[in-house]
């Protein structure tokens, strides 16, 4: 094995060799998942702490290669304060022939909403600020034509100033794509995805926001189902059984027959579940946790709800450029995905590092 690339160094962490630029110092493992492992580090160029994700076997198969390309392109496309941003992407390879590793550098966030809910009871002001930011990020993502599909507390990062960013777009898919059944952690999953009822739309993410908001308000999950059937039962105990109009929209005959076999349940008054909560919070929840996805509020509509009157500013809730999915919708070979990914790595322009304090702008 030859030595590290010029300007890079190697370090073994959790039985994995990392090869990173010398400006990334003090690598410390912070977690790992199916798609890669993450270290925190100090970036001497950006003068800030960052998260470095090493993708695991990015080109192991056609599916891996397409997912790698997609994740990189999505991260490059999305630039918003409430969405995790790409600070850098690199590979130790110096040619396409050696290209087998991809590292993504993003903002380091301290905690996720899971940690926050476990550690402290949140005030109504906290909940307002967190859910406002979540919806602000979601409005931006949705305006690009992207559905996240996997929103849950562990995918929502928060720093010590209560600033929030949405993470993990590995599973996000374009809005007009054929939809399949198995993606998010079940408790936060909209019923139409969970049971493969019908083609779904961006409001699946709004259902997830409703579940997250409910958890922030009461300190525990709203629908902690033990399996699909239990999950559906818990949902219907709160929102009631679907009306004939909603049933008619369910394309799965199996799901329709099953729901019709259940005893009818009335919709519960949410204020009886969230005792003492701000009535505006309860009103907003009631607009998000709606079985009929056509009747759920959009992210943009939710931002204008009176619950966020302290924060809502239509001039400061930006939208994204549309995301062009045609490139990744095509059938390609593994080598072609790899080549496209390599081009995306090479064409990335990192953000400008901060100017040292006291430095003067010099006119060229």
UniProtKB/Swiss-Prot annotation:
Cystine pairs: none
GO MF annotation terms: ATP binding; MAP kinase activity; protein serine kinase activity; protein serine/threonine kinase activity
Gene Ontology cellular component list: cytoplasm; cytosol; nucleoplasm; nucleus
GO BP, sorted A to Z: bone development; cardiac muscle cell proliferation; cellular response to interleukin-1; cellular response to UV-B; cellular response to virus; cellular senescence; intracellular signal transduction; negative regulation of cardiac muscle cell proliferation
The family this protein is said to belong to: Belongs to the protein kinase superfamily. CMGC Ser/Thr protein kinase family. MAP kinase subfamily.
Naturally occurring in which organism (per UniProt): Homo sapiens (Human)
UniProt note on tissues of expression: Highest levels in the brain and heart. Also expressed in the placenta, lung, liver, skeletal muscle, kidney and pancreas.
Name of the protein in its database record: Mitogen-activated protein kinase 11
Subcellular locations according to the entry: Cytoplasm; Nucleus
